[in-house]
Regions:
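An amphipathic, basic-hydrophobic alpha-helix
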Residues: 60-90, 100-108, 130-137
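Short His-centered aromatic/hydrophobic patch
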Residues: 93-99, 118
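N-terminal strand-loop element at the rim of the active site
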Residues: 5-13, 17-73, 162-167, 235-237
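A conserved nucleotide-sugar
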Residues: 30-34, 209-251
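Donor nucleotide-sugar binding/catalytic pocket of nucleotide-sugar-dependent glycosyltransferases
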Residues: 57, 139-185
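Nucleotide-sugar donor-binding and catalytic loop/hinge architecture
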Residues: 1, 184-196, 221-222, 248
Length: 251
C-alpha cells in the first residue's frame, strides 16, 4: 500500500518527530511511504525521514510559505503533481495551518481515504464548524493526540485500538508514542540540592512558552538555586530573552 503523509513543515518539532515515528511504523509494516512537505523544511529533518524509509517531496524549493489564494493554487498544483506521480491509496494529513485546505484539495483531486490528525486542543479555533464538516464529510478518520483534545473538538472521546470498528463514529484518540527505552525517573526529588528544570519546545505562544520564564521566576524566589535550561527556537526568542533580564533570572 502506498501512503501519502502531508505536513506543512519539516523542522525540528514534536509534530515532526511524531510523524517520523509514524513513518517508521508504516515502513516496518511493509508500506511505501511518501512524505509531502508544503513549506518550510530543514535538510537534517528531510534526511531523517529518508533514512526512516520515506520518499520526501518538498513542494517549495526554497522552503518558504505561500499564503492566500496564491497559497491555495500552490498547494493544488503541488498535490496534484504528487498524486499523479505516486497514486497513493491513503493520505494522512497533519491538521496544522493551512488546516483544512489540503484535505479539501485532496478530496477534490479524488482521494477518498483520508486520515487527519490534530495536534492541539480546539481552543485555538474561533469556531469548529469547518473542523466538524471535515470530520463528517471529508475524512475516513479524525484522530487527536489526547482524549482532552478530542473532547474539546467533539464533546466525547474514545481511545482507539486495533479492534475499534470504524462505523458512524470516526473520531478517536491515539496517543503519541514514546521512544523505545524511554525511562521515567521515579525517585522523589527535593529542593535540598539544586534542581535543573529543562524545557524543549518551539518558542511560540501556542506552546505556552510566553509563561515559562515568569513562572520560573516565582519558583526561583523560593528556591534560589534552581536552574532553568530552555532548548528551542521560535518567534518568542527575543521576548523570552528580555523576560530573563526583567525577571532577574540570568544567574
Amino acid at each position: 500500500m502506498t501512503i501519502l503523509i502531508c505536513i506543512p513543515c519539516l523542522m525540528t518539532g514534536g509534530t515532526e518527530i511524531q510523524t517520523l515515528n509514524l513513518v517508521q511504523a508504516l515502513v516496518a509494516g511493509g508500506h511505501r511511504v511518501v512524505t509531502t512537505c508544503y513549506f518550510e523544511y530543514s535538510d537534517d529533518m528531510v534526511v531523517r525521514f529518508q533514512k526512516a524509509g520515506s520518499e520526501v517531496v518538498c513542494l517549495s524549493p526554497t522552503g518558504t510559505r505561500v499564503n492566500g489564494w496564491r497559497g491555495i493554487l500552490f498547494l493544488y498544483k503541488g498535490l496534484r503533481r504528487v498524486l499523479k506521480q505516486y497514486k497513493p491509496d491513503v493520505a494522512h494529513v497533519q491538521y496544522m495551518a493551512p488546516g483544512a485546505i489540503p484535505i479539501l484539495l485532496l478530496r477534490w483531486l479524488g482521494v477518498r481515504q483520508i486520515i487527519a490528525t490534530a495536534h492541539t486542543a480546539a481552543d485555538i479555533y474561533p469556531n469548529l464548524r469547518l473542523v466538524h464538516f471535515i470530520q463528517r464529510h471529508c475524512v475516513r478518520v479524525f484522530t487527536c493526540i489526547t482524549e482532552l483534545a478530542e473532547r474539546s473538538f467533539f464533546g466525547t472521546s474514545r481511545l482507539y485500538n486495533e479492534n475499534t470498528p470504524l462505523n458512524k463514529r470516526n473520531h478517536f484518540t491515539i496517543y503519541n508514542a514514546l521512544p523505545p527505552g524511554f525511562s521515567i525517573v521515579r525517585e522523589n526529588r527535593s529542593f535540598v540540592r539544586p534542581i535543573t528544570i529543562g524545557v524543549v519546545s518551539r518558542l511560540e505562544e501556542i506552546k505556552g512558552m510566553d509563561l515559562v520564564v515568569p513562572a520560573f521566576a516565582q519558583v526561583k524566589k523560593r528556591y534560589p538555586d534552581t536552574r532553568l535550561v530552555i532548548v528551542g527556537d521560535g518567534s518568542l526568542r527575543v521576548k523570552m530573552q528580555r523576560q530573563v533580564q526583567e525577571c532577574d533570572c540570568t544567574e
